[in-house]
């Protein structure tokens, strides 16, 4: 054992399939899998550990179940259990570089998604495999000719980040003069027992190759079973060469999803938010901490819940969510969403940065059966990990 001891505090809620990350007070110089042991029961708890950008140790764990107010005291054991290799077999998130433009993400040897960079104007995740083993985002325009799929909006690339008016450059569409997001490097592409992590460093360029915005995008893919697949997104935009104006337009989403065509709201799908609003009419252009979009894929009810963290810029965000399948968080399009009552223009001063923080959950059923209300509490008031 070492001198690192932690306590897990569940808090006043039951927790099911709950990911937890925390930054420790000190830099313990841990990197990779860290094994924690409950000395009372002998149970082992694997975690992923790394040194973050602030030079502190960050750890991630996943808890299949915690009871109300449960406390678990754990100590770090650098050797781990004798049978750790068998315990870890198949139970990991793997991030594998497939090519210079593709990274495959698997959970317990089952495909989740593929990250594409420097392709189709901006990074995106496609395909995305849902709770029952079928893709639950639209395949067009990456794949053409799939029976029954809609073919509108070719800039809707499964799961992506984009915005339509950045210093008057269109970073949303794929029109002739549209901007691009060029991935300059991928400094982190790590596998783990609790989480797989990818960090992208992007430049948002105009058609002439000039840029005023740099982006750091971190994606965390948690080791959770199908029906509970969870990804955390942190998008940080920085003005590097001049002030940057984000103009007011509905055309954008700092996190965007195009759901599978069979899930569309006008094909029997269901859009709902945390306040009980249902459908495009009640949810489009409204503020809410989370929105859920569910529908049928090959006879199974599945959905996406998009949750915004309170630390995110202009929380709670407005939602650009449509019956035809678009699902995106847009904190700038206030003029459109409020029929001219408010203006969402925002100027980011040179050297300044803004951050957008979301969790995306792919689930079985609708928002009620997937317990998205409880999942939001897990996100914003997660169990605590404290050093003792």
Regions found by a protein language model. Name each.
Residues 50-66, 307-388:
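Beta-strand-rich recognition/accessory modules
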Residues 86-114, 130-132, 136-144, 211-218, ...:
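Terminal, non-catalytic protein-protein interaction segments that mediate quaternary/complex assembly
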Residues 92-98, 189-192, 198-249:
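Acidic, contiguous internal or C-terminal segments within carbohydrate-active enzymes
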Residues 243-245, 249-318:
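Active-site/ligand-binding surface loops and adjacent short beta/alpha elements
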Residues 108, 115-130, 224-272:
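Acidic (Asp/Glu-rich), glycine- and aromatic
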Residues 70-81, 109, 200-202, 217, ...:
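Short, hydrophobic/aromatic-enriched beta-strand segments in well-ordered soluble domains
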Residues 20-22, 59, 74, 198-200, ...:
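Hydrophobic residues positioned within well-ordered beta-strands of beta-sheet architectures
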Residues 1-92, 115, 119-201:
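Alpha-mannosidase-like glycoside hydrolase catalytic domains involved in N-glycan trimming
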């Amino acid at each position: 054992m070492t001198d690192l001891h932690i306590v897990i505090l569940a808090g006043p809620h039951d927790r099911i399939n709950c990911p937890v990350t925390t930054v420790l007070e000190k830099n313990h110089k841990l990197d990779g899998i860290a094994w924690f042991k409950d000395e009372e029961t002998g149970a082992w708890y694997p975690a992923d550990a790394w040194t973050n950008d602030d030079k502190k140790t960050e750890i991630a764990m996943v808890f299949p179940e915690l009871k109300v107010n449960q406390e678990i005291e754990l100590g770090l054991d650098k050797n781990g259990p004798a049978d750790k290799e068998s315990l870890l077999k198949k139970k990991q998130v793997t991030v594998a570089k497939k090519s210079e433009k593709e990274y495959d993400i698997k959970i317990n040897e089952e495909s989740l998604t593929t990250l594409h960079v420097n392709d189709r104007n901006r990074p995106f995740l496609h395909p995305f495999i849902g709770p029952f083993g079928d893709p639950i985002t639209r395949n067009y325009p990456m794949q053409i000719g799939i029976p029954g799929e809609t073919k509108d909006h070719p800039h809707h690339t499964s799961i992506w980040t984009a915005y339509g008016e950045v210093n008057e450059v269109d970073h949303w569409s794929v029109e002739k003069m549209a901007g691009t997001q060029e991935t300059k490097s991928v400094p982190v592409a790590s596998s783990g027992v609790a989480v797989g992590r990818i960090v992208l460093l992007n430049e948002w360029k105009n058609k002439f190759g000039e840029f005023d915005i740099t982006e750091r995008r971190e994606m965390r893919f948690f080791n959770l079973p199908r029906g509970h697949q969870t990804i955390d997104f942190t998008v940080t935009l920085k003005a590097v060469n001049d002030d940057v104006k984000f103009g007011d337009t509905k055309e954008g989403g700092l996190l965007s999803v195009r759901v599978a065509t069979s899930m569309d709201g006008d094909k029997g799908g269901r859009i709902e938010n945390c306040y009980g609003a249902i459908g495009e009419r009640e949810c489009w252009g409204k503020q809410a901490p989370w929105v859920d979009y569910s529908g049928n894929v090959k006879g199974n009810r599945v959905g996406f819940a998009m949750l915004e963290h309170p630390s995110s810029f202009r929380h709670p965000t407005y939602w650009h969510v449509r019956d035809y399948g678009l699902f995106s968080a847009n904190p700038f399009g206030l003029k459109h969403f409020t029929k001219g009552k408010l203006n969402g223009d925002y100027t980011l001063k040179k050297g300044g940065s803004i951050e957008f923080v979301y969790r995306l959950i792919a689930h079985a059923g609708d928002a009620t059966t997937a317990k998205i209300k409880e999942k939001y509490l897990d996100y914003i008031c997660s169990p605590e990990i404290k050093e003792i």
